[in-house]
A protein has these predicted regions:
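N-terminal loops that bind phosphate or other acidic moieties
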Residues: 1-46, 56-57, 61-173
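Glycine- and acidic-rich phosphate- and metal-coordinating loops
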Residues: 53
Length: 173
């Protein structure tokens, strides 16, 4: 009924280090977020937890389901748009747009005092697009992190997800 998914090894490492969850029992989906959702629905899963780096999953917040850079790379533009929504001053938004990586942009947003609100909004948007893709057939939760900053935000039900897994699998997570 439940499946844990991460685009790559960093997500697996983050989950093990932060939550003690061994994602060897999970699925690595690479850049194919949309296809992974389609397969999970087809296989009859009811819940999915997607854990990923801000640099990968920010694209999903823009509705992009194949996150490979050759398909789309609007990471800074999306980060800037969510920053505008949360009222970040224009000079900091310009600085974000000049960044090469999302990790580089995070201290700028942290300095604005709006980082938690921005990340929460991004996770909400990621979940919106994930569930839109699933067409109501799969509840999807999300945990967003950065290598240097750890967990940035998670969907409201993400923590409950671990309890469900523990009950179903009868083991400590």
């Amino acid at each position: 009924d439940y499946v844990a998914v991460s685009p790559g090894n960093y997500g697996l490492d983050f989950m093990k280090k932060t939550y003690g969850y061994d994602l060897d029992r999970s699925v690595k989906c690479s850049n194919f977020i949309g296809d992974t959702i389609d397969m999970a629905v087809e296989l009859g899963f009811k819940k999915m937890l997607l854990t990923g780096h801000i640099g990968k999953l920010i694209k999903v917040a823009g509705g992009i389901m194949n996150t490979h850079s050759k398909e789309a790379d609007c990471r800074m533009e999306l980060l800037a748009a969510f920053s505008v929504k949360e009222g970040v001053e224009i000079e900091k938004i310009r600085q974000v747009l000049d960044c090469v990586t999302t990790e580089e942009a995070i201290p700028i947003l942290e300095d604005s005092g709006k980082l938690p609100a921005i990340m929460e909004t991004i996770v909400e948007r990621i979940c919106f697009y994930l569930e839109k893709r699933a067409k109501g057939k799969l509840q999807i939760d999300c945990i967003l992190y950065a290598n240097e900053f750890g967990e940035l935000a998670k969907s409201k039900e993400a923590v409950k997800w671990f309890t469900l897994l523990e009950q179903e699998q009868g083991q400590s997570i």
